Amino acid sequence: MEKILVLDFGGQYNQLIARRVRDNNVYAEILPYTAPLSEIKEGNYKGIIFTGGPNSVFDMSSPHYTKEILELGIPVLGICYGCQLISWMVGGNVETAEQSEYGKIDLTVTKKQSEIFADVDETSVVWMSHTDRVKVMPSGFEITAKTEACPIAAYENEEKKIYGVQFHPEVTHTQFGFKILHNFLYNVCGCHGDWKMDSFIDDTVKSLREKIGDKKVILGLSGGVDSSVAAGLLSRAVGKQLTCVFVDQGLMRKDEGNFVEKTFTSLFDMNFVRVNCQDHFINALKGVSDPEQKRKIIGTEFYKVFWDEIRKQAEKGFFAQGTIYPDCIESGKGDADKIKTHHNKVKMPDDVEFIDVIEPLSSLFKDEVRAVGEKLGIPHELVWRQPFPGPGLGVRIIGEITKEKIEVLQNADWVLRDEMAKNGYEKNLAQFFCVLPGVNTVGVMGDHRTYDNLVAIRAVTTDDFMTADWAKIPYDILAKVSNRITNEVKHVNRVVYDITSKPPGTVEWE
């Protein structure tokens, strides 16, 4: 399989670069700038991309790399900081720019015959985000593009196949960004494009069968996208050798537990174990209102219930997880041995032993996981499931959690989802849900005064969840949702809409 290395120097778009490469049907993997040269030599990469980063190359505490990487005969593309770093490594001069460039900037291609600018307009819009720039080109390199404030916006050494661009081709704001990356991958690196989800499924199923043999596999199934797709792949590979353990703590959306069970027992050949334990969790949460304490209790009790069920399985065999690629990436922003902790990485108790851990999705980004899920025939509702907090509705009920509050919130949330679906508006939203703030308000229903629950609606639009804006849902849809909730959901007499962006707020209320 063809591979491109994305060498991480701490930029915010590093995962996006890898995803854009994969969008071109070429596999990309990310390594931190601390990866030894020997590892890169052994990687059999078709090309290397130096990422951006927040540092200045002339600060000796900034991330650097040995010059030998440019002598491996592998094509290299430097982006932003990576562009400056390559120039610095081979004798160029980098300076703090007289005028920084941020946002959309007009780029002029000065060498039309450049391989990476093939079929790119002479003038186009690119996305810039830099305070430093290359001032003097190193020997053997030539300028291929410029902007008004950046005379060296792109350069190349065609003979050595080393390229640099000061802008960010990976972001959608760069008009020909996808084409520029495509040109580097196909025109310069000589890739053919063998990274496709159909072949991934076939290859993964084959390797799973070889590894598992006739042993058993246990997977913790949450009903989320990652564990669901992992279950689908494992089921296709080993069928009844797979046992999925689904802990229903009673804090899921309305009828979601039944939907998950029905989906996997009807579509896939596997053993499905459902543990219904709502009462257990409600008892453990009795009298607790602090959000962090609730999270801790839910996590601790889930861990206990899940592993108690695992211990009941006669044969352990292998343990499978829905770990995906972003869970595994080492970040160039910190120490190389520091890996992000994530809920998809499960800690095992000391008294439970397995042959090995299997992570069939560990090479995929989330969008690729969804693509695999669709090809496996997993329902759209699961494949495109919105982000849902690990503690479930436990962090959407402000204050103490009771069975009655769960029912109110589940019913209100179901109405919201139903109306968004009926109006075809759900595709416009990154996330939407109801919150029970724990506030009662005075109302009038018929001839009677009421003092019942207030329900808040939260809906946001975002590309990355780092920032988010409140969604501008049409008033007529909001009015219909409010009317239905107050009429159909018992013990609710008022509905409000949260119009707070992130920052200063967060998407979830707790």
Q: Where are the predicted features?
A:
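Active-site regions of oxyanion-processing enzymes, predominantly non-cytosolic
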Residues: A320
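RNA-binding accessory domains that recognize and position tRNA/RNA substrates
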Residues: M1-F50, P54-M60, H64-L72, W88-G317, ...
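Gly/Ala-rich beta-loop-alpha elbow adjacent to hydrolase catalytic centers
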Residues: G78, G82, S87
